[in-house]
Amino acid sequence: MRTEPELDRRVLVDLLRDRYALDIERLDFIPLGIDSWSYAAVRSDSSRVFVKLVRPAVVGATPRGAELPLLAALAEVGRVSVARPLPDRAGRLMSAVGGYEIAVLEYLEGRSLEDEATWPDALYGRVAEAVAAIHASTDAVRHLVPRVERFELPFLTSFARTLAALQAGRPVADDEAMPIELRDLVGPRAVELQAGIERLTDLRDGARTRGRRQVAEEVLCHTDLWGSNLLLADDGTLHVLDWDGALLGPPEHDLFMFAGTGFFPAERLGWFLDRYEAAFRPVRLSADLLAFYLYRRSFEDLAGFVRDLAEGTADAMGAVETLGIVASIIDDVLRLEERVLHVREILRDRA
């Protein structure tokens, strides 16, 4: 998050002292992330630990901190650089205070790649090696991975309802006014977005059929390998952060990020795969699965931002910035088939 949580810093310092035996002299807020809050906690000896705060999970969702035992195991395996979680005095990896759940981890030095406009090929090559290292770690940590890919679209029903309301100019709920700017932005594109939703559901159905046939190809997936979750150290080490979305799934779940997102152009997918396979092993990828992940990620992001605007909960970024993000995502969604075509051509040439 860009703004600090509603929690007195002294409460957090006391918790770190009493439960973790950490003598903290200063908390430095780190204004990054979308659904969590982060601090660098500076100790009396000038060393630091990383403190992450999240809201408790909703009923039925994966519990917060489910990925922490996995992180501890990955740190031991050593194939990929991750922040090792630090247990409290009772050996627990999560604590709770003031309506937040808290994890304390090793502090990793480096710069976030979130705001990097362009990356050199050497860095992309290092990212390909990191993806390969994650997938190659599967056998050692399989028993600790908290989830398995089910190709679900939990956001879609609500988004379709919101989209219909925007198209008709109705409020999303009886007690809410529809933001005019949101209606004017999304309403004229509603028919095209509905077609995209139908395409996504078709891809989902195909992914489920394929997934039942090829369970043996499941690997450990990070699922959110983009700049804000990558930290580049001065010595060239690439640290991989934020593993709360980790699951067992097809390699396409990580590789789609390099198949035509704002993160990486579709026409360079083959270049990336050459480096990934050299560090891992040859893989046979499905263009339809990559398309599914491209569509799902775009619509999931769009649904979340539209919901925040429609319900008046876009406080963390602000309504104006969020509207800009929605406009950008819509433009991307309407160009997805161009990217999928590039992907099909590249995979066909590699076959």
Functional labels for PLM-detected ranges:
Residues R170, P179, W271, A303-A351:
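ATP/Mg2+ or Mg2+-diphosphate-binding catalytic cores
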Residues P56, I102-E116, A165-P179, F299-M317:
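A glycine-centered beta->alpha junction motif in the catalytic cores
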Residues A117-P188, E218:
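A cross-family kinase active-site recognition segment
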Residues M1-L27:
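Juxta-kinase regulatory segment immediately upstream of eukaryotic protein kinase catalytic domains
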